[in-house]
Design a protein with these regions (language model features):
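Hydrophobic alpha-helical segments and helix pairs
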Residues: 98-148
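Bacterial N-terminal signal peptides
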Residues: 20-32
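Gly/Pro-enriched, hydrophobic low-complexity segments
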Residues: 99-101, 105-116, 215-216, 222-239
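Solvent-exposed helix/loop surface patches that form functional interfaces
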Residues: 44-46, 58, 127-221, 231
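N-terminal cleavable signal peptides for secretion/export
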Residues: 36-103, 119-127, 187, 192-194, ...
């Protein structure tokens, strides 16, 4: 397993990164879920939330796409599971410049443990699938089979090993949702790792209190989180 330094290279919130739009989708999921009170996987079959996504860079803020996040009861390898799904498609200026149709799926056991995740990237003529399969050993070790491929060839086929909390990008939002925010204090930190290709990237959620958000003449009391990512691939992310 690769060693990672704990120097925070990037700190990000939704719509803060100009180079990787899928990161913005992930951050928006995190930010949007913070308006809910969290218990241990407080899920209901058939939950669905639709998002309008905006791309922000400096003073420019333009509509970037549409996303749908849904949860339903399902099965994975014959056992009951939660199926967590995110569909994204670009819109507005982004659609004209760089067409995107991305899908992310997770299967969680009822315990809960992340069992499987898949990200399917469809961007113009580019199509890529990232699959992660998680197996939990008695010693506390987690074995992760990472398989990345296009329609023509395999890009990555390797095993990752870790201990502690490990998720894909979408599964990390499920972890955030499972935290008990009622007893959370300002500055609380929750470290974890994100499995991406051959890498295990160190990250953490950082709680910075409640915030009132106004939208379409309505006010919402939300919980405000940052995600700190300790990897050079996210060095352009910023607050």
């Amino acid at each position: 397993m690769r060693e990672h330094s704990l120097r925070p290279i990037g700190t990000a919130v939704w719509a803060a990164c100009a180079s990787k739009l899928y990161i913005c989708v992930f951050f928006l999921c995190v930010a949007s879920l913070t308006s809910l009170r969290a218990q241990t996987l407080p899920l209901s079959h058939g939950e669905r939330v639709d998002y309008d996504l905006y791309f922000k860079w400096g003073l420019i803020m333009s509509k970037a796409g549409l996303a749908t996040l849904s949860v339903k009861e399902s099965e994975y390898q014959g056992a009951p599971s939660w199926h967590y799904n995110l569909l994204f498609r670009s819109a507005g200026v982004i659609e004209k410049v760089f067409r995107m149709r991305d899908t992310m799926d997770c299967h969680y056991s009822k315990e809960p443990r992340l069992l499987f995740s898949s990200k399917r990237t469809n961007e113009g003529d580019y199509y890529l699938v990232d699959n992660l399969q998680f197996e939990y050993q008695g010693s506390g070790r987690i074995d992760i089979h990472s398989h990345r491929h296009t329609l023509k060839e395999t890009k990555i086929d390797t095993m990752l090993m870790a201990k502690g909390r490990v998720f894909d990008m979408l599964g990390a939002t499920m972890y955030l949702r499972s935290l008990d925010w009622r007893t959370m204090s300002y500055g609380a930190e929750f470290p974890f790792m994100i499995a991406i290709g051959r890498e295990l990237v160190n990250a953490r959620f950082r709680y910075t209190g409640q915030q009132i958000v106004e939208h379409k003449e309505a006010k919402f009391r939300t919980r405000h989180f940052y995600i700190d990512i300790y990897d050079e691939a996210f060095s352009q992310a910023k607050e």
